[in-house]
């Protein structure tokens, strides 16, 4: 799936980030005009950094 082309995403989807964090989408999306891609806000749901939010290109994450 090409998440970088999606202007919005459902909240609550779980992914494993490229560095191994278990994250969940919040439903917030931001367009990066310089690269013409969308990134999606995720929150760490367990382990180190739990509760922290960051933007992630979900094309590089593993859907769970």
Regions found by a protein language model. Name each.
Residues 42-44:
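SH3/SH3-like beta-barrel fold
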Residues 48-64:
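Intrinsically disordered, low-complexity, charged/polar segments
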Residues 18-20, 47:
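Short, surface-exposed secondary-structure boundary micro-motifs
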Residues 32-37, 48-50:
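Short, solvent-exposed loop/turn segments that connect beta-strands within catalytic domains
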Residues 20-32:
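Short beta-strand-centered aromatic/proline hotspots
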Residues 1-15:
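Mixed-charge, Lys/Arg-rich low-complexity intrinsically disordered regions
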Residues 8-11, 34-39:
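A short, compositionally biased
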């Amino acid at each position: 799936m090409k998440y970088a082309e999606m202007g919005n995403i459902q909240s609550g989807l779980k992914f494993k980030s490229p560095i191994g964090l278990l994250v969940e989408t919040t439903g917030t999306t931001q367009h990066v005009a310089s690269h013409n891609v969308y990134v999606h806000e995720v929150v760490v749901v367990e382990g180190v950094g739990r509760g922290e939010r960051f933007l992630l290109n979900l094309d590089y994450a593993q859907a769970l």
